[in-house]
């Protein structure tokens, strides 16, 4: 828990120091009250006392109480500010860290767990700062101060108070030993229930299609019951604490009065009033001592959950992704590439030496093994794609097609060999610079909540800051925060040129026809995940998004599978015309999609078993020939 406090800002530390001062002030005022109570008791018992003196002492008590109230309000105000801004910072740190994660890190944590860590766990930390931190600071100060006040006032009373404190600490220790292991289990079980709920909501259509509602309900009930039983155990254990604290506190007061009664009975007439006054004061201070330990016990209730949550949050923040960004921001120039032997002098003859290579991809004896696997997914892959080339990849399911193209944008790094883009090893590139060169269309098309326009133009833009300033959570909330977010969206409004590029990209992807039929056309609303459009429409918008970037390299991971043959052909022809200078890598299952490619790579069990044009592979590669014969007619094969 203490490690996460290093993320507090200087302003927040200053606010906590102010809270510390006001807590000390509050303790001082609280411990002054028994003194005035003793004085009023003495005045009441004193003959010939003036009522005015009692009113003065009572007025001082009211002022002291008001001072305590003011200090408590100031402490609560600054604690709430610190908790809100600190929680915001932790969520932002987690989000930005998760954005740097690759598939291996996502697999390690799981999406459901990451959501829980950035919401529920951060809330637990905020709750501790708002309430627990005050108690953690206040309780020891109050305990020490109150003990100093009562030291030497009476051996019997002091011994009784000490016994009560020991009993209290033993009870709290036993309870904490019982419940602390359960708090970590509760966070894990919360992850599980979020996972089941998210899986059910995401796969709702499949659940209904297979009439698996009862099965899903059973899975949810199992997870829900496990979480509920754990919560019941901790709640039952913690429910003993408050009655136990009250019993100890009331028992101590009773013991003090009982001992005081015997002391007063045996005292002389002149000492009775002094003993009675001391008993009242001692009782009040003893209750303050018990209250301080009671507050400390409340800290023990909040601390375990916050500590577990802080550990889980720090686990995310401190996780270093396997794929680390390099420093290079550009590829080689023609002169550099010629000197490095990346291209030959004949290839460089038609270009100026100061021009940069663009869209050139080279795999040099690349092998790849997934982090948690022992078997290689790819072995000894070598090929080159020059600017403007169309390279297709085909093979059976599980042959490594998607794994191969995932190495280009560095979703994973090669286990052996090297992947070069524009003559530079991709591991040397700054990740942002590398991915700015690439337009990527994933196998499972995904659209974001927004509009057609915002989805097609998705991504960063030249001149925009990489780190967007965070909204100040301590100053903006509710509708004000919503207005700030809307204002930020308005500031990202497309220029006329960008809107024209959106329309061009949709034309290339053959999406304009259905987009214009939607309400609002390019401003039509898109639901999260693109659930309000068909699979083919999602794919076309995903293709448009990649084309909009005007990248050096276009990667299509089986991105034409949801298109009919006619649309598939039209889209590929449009891409050939519009993005003729871009290098295109196409993963496909349909031979008809890749027949016109400049080079076709045939993968089988992670190995490159064929490389050439469609006609060449029909003659030289058995695997390709079998795939083609299973899909094409005799006339198409002989054409």
Where are these regions (language model features)?
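Transmembrane helix-loop-helix hairpins at lipid-water interfaces of multipass membrane proteins
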Residues: 10-74, 78, 151-156, 265-276
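Helix-loop-helix
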Residues: 50, 145, 149-166, 176, ...
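ABC-type nucleotide-binding domain
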Residues: 334-639
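Residue-level recognition of pore/gate-forming positions within transmembrane alpha-helices
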Residues: 23, 65, 135, 139, ...
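Juxtamembrane helix-loop junctions of ABC transporter transmembrane domains
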Residues: 1, 21-22, 29-42, 55, ...
């Amino acid at each position: 828990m203490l490690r996460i406090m290093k993320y507090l800002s200087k302003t927040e530390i200053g606010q906590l120091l102010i809270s510390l001062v006001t807590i000390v002030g509050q303790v001082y005022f609280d411990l002054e009250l028994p003194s005035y109570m003793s004085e009023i008791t003495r005045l009441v018992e004193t003959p010939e006392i003036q009522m005015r003196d009692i009113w003065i002492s009572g007025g001082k008590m009211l002022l002291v109480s008001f001072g305590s109230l003011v200090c408590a309000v100031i402490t609560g105000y600054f604690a709430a500010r610190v908790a809100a801004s600190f929680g915001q910072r932790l969520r932002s740190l987690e989000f930005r860290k998760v954005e740097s994660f690759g598939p291996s890190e996502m697999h390690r944590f799981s999406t459901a767990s990451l959501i829980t860590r950035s919401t529920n766990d951060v809330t637990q930390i905020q709750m501790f700062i708002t309430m627990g931190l005050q108690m953690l600071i206040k309780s020891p100060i109050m305990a020490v101060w109150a003990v100093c006040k009562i030291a030497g006032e009476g051996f019997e009373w002091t011994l009784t108070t000490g016994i009560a404190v020991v009993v209290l600490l033993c009870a709290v220790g036993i309870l904490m030993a019982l419940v602390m292991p359960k708090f970590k289990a509760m966070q894990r079980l919360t992850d599980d229930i979020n996972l089941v709920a998210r899986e059910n909501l995401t796969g709702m259509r499949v659940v209904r299609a297979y009439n698996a509602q009862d099965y899903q309900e059973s899975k949810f009930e199992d997870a829900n019951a496990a979480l509920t039983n754990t919560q019941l155990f901790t709640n039952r254990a913690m429910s003993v604490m408050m009655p136990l604290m009250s019993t100890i506190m009331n028992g101590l007061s009773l013991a003090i009065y009982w001992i005081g009664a015997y002391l007063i009975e045996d005292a002389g007439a002149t000492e009775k009033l002094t003993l009675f006054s001391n008993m009242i004061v001692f009782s009040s201070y003893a209750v303050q001592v018990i209250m301080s330990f009671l507050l400390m016990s409340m800290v023990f209730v909040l601390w375990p959950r916050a500590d577990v949550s802080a550990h889980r949050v720090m686990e995310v923040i401190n996780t270093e992704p396997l794929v680390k960004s390099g420093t290079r921001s550009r590829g080689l120039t023609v002169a550099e590439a010629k000197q490095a032997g990346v291209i030959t002098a004949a290839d460089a003859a038609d270009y100026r030496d100061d021009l940069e290579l663009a869209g050139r991809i080279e795999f040099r004896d690349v092998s790849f093994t997934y982090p948690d696997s022992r078997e290689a997914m790819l072995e000894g892959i070598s090929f080159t794609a020059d600017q403007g080339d169309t390279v297709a990849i085909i093979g059976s399911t599980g042959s490594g097609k998607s794994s191969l193209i995932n190495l280009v944008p560095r979703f994973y790094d090669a286990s052996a060999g090297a992947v070069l883009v524009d003559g530079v090893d991709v591991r040397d590139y700054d990740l942002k610079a590398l991915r700015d060169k690439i337009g990527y269309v994933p196998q499972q098309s995904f659209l974001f909540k927004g509009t057609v326009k915002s989805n097609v133009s998705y991504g960063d833009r030249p001149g925009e800051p990489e780190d967007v300033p965070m909204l100040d959570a301590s100053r903006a909330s509710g509708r004000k925060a919503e207005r700030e977010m809307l204002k930020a969206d308005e500031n990202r409004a497309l220029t006329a040129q960008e809107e024209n590029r959106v329309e061009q990209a949709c034309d290339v992807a053959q999406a304009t026809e259905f987009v214009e039929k939607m309400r609002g056309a390019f401003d039509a609303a898109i639901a999260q995940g693109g659930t309000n459009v068909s699979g083919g429409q999602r794919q076309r918008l995903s293709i448009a998004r990649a084309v909009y970037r005007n990248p050096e390299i276009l990667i299509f991971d089986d991105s034409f599978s949801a298109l009919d043959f006619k649309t598939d052909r039209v889209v590929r022809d449009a891409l050939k015309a519009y993005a003729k200078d871009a290098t295109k890598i196409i993963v496909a299952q349909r031979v008809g999609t890749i027949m016109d490619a400049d080079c076709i790579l045939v993968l089988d069990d992670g190995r490159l078993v064929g490389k050439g044009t469609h006609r060449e592979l029909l003659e030289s590669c058995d695997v390709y020939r079998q795939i083609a014969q299973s899909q094409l007619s005799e006339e198409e094969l002989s054409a």
